[in-house]
Amino acid sequence: WYEERAMYYMGIMYNDNKEYGKSVVALQEFIDKYPNSKNVPSAIYVQGESLLALDRADEAKLFFEDLITRFPKSNEAKEAKKRLKK
């Protein structure tokens, strides 16, 4: 449980520190290890945001679309839909 939270927050911290590439990788490692975590939708959303910050909009779009498909009722999916409209 602690490792799960630590891995998630490490990815968030990288994003907050503008280390976007590290954020994408760390959050993917978190998702791969804890695919059923309640934080997966948030992790995918932050990956998309990190990719946008890296000017990798096409990749970000794929992450947002995946989020909307896999977690359509999540708050993050609603935000992802807004990001796709921009």
Q: What would you call each of these model-derived segments?
A:
Residues 1-86:
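Acidic, polar-rich low-complexity tracts and alpha-helical solenoid repeat scaffolds
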